[in-house]
């Protein structure tokens, strides 16, 4: 099913028992996080806090708190169907010309989906039913969650930050946390390689005296939200990809104070600018690592306008030690990554980002090994092919007889097929997440690849072990008599 706006998605979730309305008064200061965290850890429903303490606007949490809800938000029946979405992205990333008429006919469904890519610009939109401007702007009227007791201030978490570089036609949508520091001020924490930061840097070089326009949408439709966290090709806008997910064009409307187009169905939109010379010290905040991060200076976003629906919903989340919502998103989007990687490396059988690895810091890859040194090639490919994995610290490569998603299997492969000196590849001075305080220098650290494959000639001088296997006839015989033996499973 496809959803035109967030409300349609919430209606369906409620029908399926996947949304719980909380009518009791709950404080956005710490209490919502505690309730959301307990609920998510048990695979529970999305939560709509209808009576946040001190505020009139309800708060939505845990929207994508299970992989199944992520798949639903992308218009898919289950997480397995996300593989097909990954195949479409692989096609868009590197489209292949048809080899003949039959192949052309086979590609028609993919090209038909591309027709849904351009956005549809509206003159009037629900997200602008209420307009607050200038001195009336007061971010303290929004129920912005204060997630952890060590956090320095309330934090905007699920805002879709919309930017555009001076030389680009496409808009960029990114999700960057934003610290509340004043009634019209937020700190925009974006890392230097992210799309918004790149747009900002290009703007500074081209317009040394003009503020950088920014709009932030909260509570967009699920396809648009998820497009912002999906590994789409750099040449494709998130709005275009959302149109593919939804099956019809993304409806947008021009911001009131700038030329940026925002999701027409968004619940709340913050409009404003970043002064090129204004920064502030951000943090500390509890993050997806399970720790509080270091403080660092980032640009300040000045909000000049707030537009919203008359009965707006504030969409929020928390981040902490997995499981949290980012970890769940990573688990679901894992299925999207696989076909993209397989198009470049057909030997890859499976690719898994364990949620315990903080979404992306450790990857397990299984391959159909074809030659000596093959595992090392795959390691390098994982680190370099998609920008999403430039911060992956550990890549473990196993043969295809190992289940990448079973730690018992992976550990068995490491301990029986790996020699630390021969099979561990260390690379120093590589890009690392700024939040990774384990690295010796902020933003710069090392990576480790572990070759846990069976070794071929040229990789070892010893006779390699033969795995123990069971006799299939005996297995079948015991299966037939098992119940009669009276042994409990």
From Swiss-Prot:
Q: Specify the domain of life of the species encoding this protein.
A: Bacteria
Short name of any one Pfam family annotated for the protein = UbiD_C
GO BP terms: namely: ubiquinone biosynthetic process
Record-annotated residues binding Mn(2+)?
A: 172, 238
Q: Which InterPro entries match?
A: UbiD, UbiD-like_C, UbiD-like_N, UbiD_bacteria, UbiD_Rift_dom
Q: Which Gene3D superfamilies match?
A: Single helix bin, UbiD C-terminal domain-like
Protein topology in the membrane: Peripheral membrane protein
Question: Which chemical reaction does it catalyze?
Answer: a 4-hydroxy-3-(all-trans-polyprenyl)benzoate + H(+) = a 2-(all-trans-polyprenyl)phenol + CO2
Q: Report the subcellular localization.
A: Cell membrane
User: Could you give the cofactor binding note from the entry?
Assistant: Binds 1 prenylated FMN per subunit.
Q: Which PANTHER family match?
A: 3-OCTAPRENYL-4-HYDROXYBENZOATE CARBOXY-LYASE-RELATED, FERULIC ACID DECARBOXYLASE 1
- Listed NCBIfam families: PRK10922.1 (NF008175), UbiD family decarboxylase (TIGR00148)
For this entry, the protein name equals 3-octaprenyl-4-hydroxybenzoate carboxy-lyase
- Recorded source organism is Glaesserella parasuis serovar 5 (strain SH0165) (Haemophilus parasuis)
- UniProt lists the gene as ubiD
């Amino acid at each position: 099913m496809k959803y035109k706006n967030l409300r349609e998605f919430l209606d369906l979730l409620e029908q399926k028992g996947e949304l719980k309305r909380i009518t009791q008064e709950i404080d956005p200061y710490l209490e919502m996080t505690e309730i959301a965290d307990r609920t998510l850890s048990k695979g529970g429903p999305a939560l709509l806090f209808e009576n946040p303490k001190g505020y009139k606007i309800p708060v939505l949490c845990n929207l994508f708190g299970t992989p199944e809800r992520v798949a639903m938000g992308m218009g898919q029946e289950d997480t397995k169907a996300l593989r097909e979405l990954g195949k479409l992205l692989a096609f868009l990333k590197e489209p292949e010309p048809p080899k003949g008429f039959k192949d052309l006919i086979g590609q028609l469904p993919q090209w038909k989906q591309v027709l849904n890519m351009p956005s549809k610009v509206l003159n009037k939109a629900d997200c602008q039913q209420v307009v607050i401007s200038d001195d009336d702007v007061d971010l303290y009227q929004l129920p912005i969650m204060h997630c952890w007791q060590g956090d320095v201030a309330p934090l905007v978490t699920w805002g879709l930050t919309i930017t555009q570089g001076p030389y680009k036609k496409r808009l960029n949508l990114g999700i960057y946390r934003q610290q509340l520091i004043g009634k019209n001020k937020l700190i925009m924490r974006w890392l230097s390689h992210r799309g918004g930061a790149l747009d900002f840097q290009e703007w500074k070089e081209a317009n040394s005296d003009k503020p950088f326009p920014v709009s932030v949408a909260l509570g967009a439709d699920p396809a648009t939200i998820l497009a912002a966290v999906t590994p789409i090709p750099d040449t494709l806008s998130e709005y275009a990809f959302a149109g593919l997910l939804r099956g019809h064009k993304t409806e947008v409307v021009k911001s009131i104070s700038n030329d940026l187009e925002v999701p027409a169905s968004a619940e709340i939109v913050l409009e404003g600018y970043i002064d090129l010379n204004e920064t502030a010290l951000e943090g500390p905040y509890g993050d997806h690592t399970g720790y509080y991060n270091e403080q660092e200076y980032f640009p300040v976003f000045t909000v000049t306008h707030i537009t919203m629906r008359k009965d707006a919903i504030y969409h929020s989340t928390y981040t902490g030690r997995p499981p949290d919502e980012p970890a769940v998103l990573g688990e679901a989007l894992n299925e999207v990554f696989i076909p993209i990687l397989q198009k470049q490396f057909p030997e890859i059988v499976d690719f898994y980002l364990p949620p315990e690895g903080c979404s992306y810091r450790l990857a397990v890859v299984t391959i159909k090994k074809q030659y000596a040194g093959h595992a090392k090639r795959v390691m390098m490919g994982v680190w370099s092919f998609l920008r999403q994995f430039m911060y992956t610290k550990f890549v473990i490569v196993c043969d295809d007889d190992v289940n990448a998603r079973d730690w018992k299997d992976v550990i068995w492969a490491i301990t029986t097929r790996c020699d630390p000196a021969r099979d561990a590849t260390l690379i120093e001075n590589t890009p690392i997440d700024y939040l990774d305080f384990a690295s010796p220098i902020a933003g710069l650290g090392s990576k480790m690849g572990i070759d846990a494959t069976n070794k071929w000639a040229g990789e070892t001088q010893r006779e390699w072990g033969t795995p123990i296997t069971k006799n299939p006839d005996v297995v079948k015989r015991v299966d037939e008599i098992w119940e009669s033996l009276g042994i409990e499973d």
